[in-house]
């Protein structure tokens, strides 16, 4: 069975100005194992594994656009921004590129093959939130999600939710649906009956531009926050109880935003949307 249905968040990587330093931070924070891809053409691309299963990666960031600086121009010390990118599964990156253009998005990187592992492209939605798509080859995507030590959830952080309600169904096939929670009006994105992503109003964290945010599942939110600070990270929002679970919003030492969350039992977590 295919793990990731088209439109589901399938892969997650960090663009960083200093791959080695970023690898040290995240392995120290989450207990991941970092492995540098041996192919010379990979440019030092480094994968992260949790208990032997791929969860994410880090690469040297070589794209610098306003879309890749959601926390503003001063969120790095090395001349290039740091940002987590969410890759959504697709059966056809080229056809999806045409849909993005038709729906009012922007093509940041046209489709390209990646070492036989798959085919990718990078876009921005009409509000300016950057995201990528992944057509699987040898690599399908993350081997585990939704459990501590892996990506637990992703969210569209935006001030353009009206446009998003039109754009993402037309491109990724994501259907917006109400959460059913009192006082929460931002939609959850579904593939069929499966929730695969959420939405957050821009301004809740220090971000100044729309973006796709990555939430990592952890056993202990407060302890993880303390460890992040010890390793050189900083806190955007202190741990607090939310409908999804206890959560905090952080910046890594190079300014990449991410969140950590103790997933509440029975609440939707990251999933492939496969059937």
From Swiss-Prot:
Q: In which pathway does it act?
A: Antibiotic biosynthesis; daunorubicin biosynthesis; Antibiotic biosynthesis; carminomycin biosynthesis
Name the UniProt record assigns to this protein = Anthracycline biosynthesis protein DnrV
> CDD domains under this entry?
SgaA_N_like (cd07247)
Q: Where is the VOC domain?
A: 8-136, 150-263
GO annotation terms (biological process): daunorubicin biosynthetic process
Function, in words: Involved in the biosynthesis of the anthracyclines carminomycin and daunorubicin (daunomycin) which are aromatic polyketide antibiotics that exhibit high cytotoxicity and are widely applied in the chemotherapy of a variety of cancers. In vivo, it acts jointly with DoxA in the conversion of 13-deoxycarminomycin and 13-deoxydaunorubicin to yield carminomycin and daunorubicin, respectively.
Family matches, as InterPro entries: Anthracycline_SecMetBiosynth (IPR052164), Glyas_Bleomycin-R_OHBP_Dase (IPR029068), Glyas_Fos-R_dOase_dom (IPR004360), VOC (IPR037523)
Keywords tagged on the record:
Antibiotic biosynthesis, Repeat
Claim: Repeat is one of the keywords in the record: yes
Q: Does the keyword Repeat apply?
A: yes
Return any one Pfam family short name. Answer: Glyoxalase
Originating organism: Streptomyces peucetius
